[in-house]
């Protein structure tokens, strides 16, 4: 069923949407957008505590998702199942589940919410949803 959903998403592709999704997915590469936000928040005294909470969430996320779960579950990527689909980004070499981009995004959003960052967590949630969607749109995750 999952592969059928991803295959259906392929019908949504347009040159403009392809570029937008590539840009959005690259914001999540190595959690870069969340790491930058964390550093900025740590540097600002008013948001330092929230930045530390975010840093802790990202560290736990990397250990739990990228080091433990990915290797334990060892799920192949969709482009390895359906080799006919043209992948528009560099093919990741690690396993598919869980998505590091998505996990880092939602770990950050959760940290912002729990830290009481009312002005930040909602836009961060919107970005996290877009990053998660981009990973499926680009055929690198289920």
Identify the meaning behind each predicted range:
Residues 29, 44-46, 73-74, 135-142:
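Short helix-capping/hinge motifs at transmembrane helix termini and TM-loop junctions
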Residues 16-17, 46-51, 116-123:
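Membrane-helix interface segments
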Residues 56-72, 120-134:
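Small-polar-interrupted transmembrane alpha-helices in polytopic inner-membrane proteins
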Residues 86-142:
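Membrane-embedded catalytic cores of phosphoryl/pyrophosphoryl-handling enzymes
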Residues 23, 32-35, 53, 119-126:
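Alpha-helical transmembrane segments of integral membrane proteins
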Residues 1-32, 66-93:
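N-terminal transmembrane-helix/juxtamembrane module of multi-pass inner/ER membrane proteins
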Residues 34-44, 107-113:
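Hydrophobic, aromatic-rich transmembrane alpha-helices
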Residues 37-63:
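Interfacial segments of alpha-helical transmembrane regions
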């Amino acid at each position: 069923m999952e592969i059928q959903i991803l295959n259906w998403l392929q019908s949504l592709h347009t040159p403009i949407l392809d570029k937008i999704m590539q840009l959005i997915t690259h914001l999540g590469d190595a959690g870069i957008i969340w790491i930058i936000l964390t550093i900025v928040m740590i540097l600002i005294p008013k948001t330092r505590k929230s930045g530390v909470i975010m840093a802790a969430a990202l560290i736990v996320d990397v250990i739990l998702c990228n080091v433990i779960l990915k290797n334990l579950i060892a799920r192949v990527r969709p482009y390895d199942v359906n080799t006919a689909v043209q992948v528009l980004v560099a093919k990741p070499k690690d396993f598919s589940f869980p998505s590091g981009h998505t996990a880092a995004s939602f770990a950050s959003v959760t940290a912002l919410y729990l830290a009481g960052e009312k002005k930040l967590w909602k836009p961060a949630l919107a970005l996290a949803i877009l990053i998660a969607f981009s990973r499926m749109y680009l055929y690198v995750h289920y």
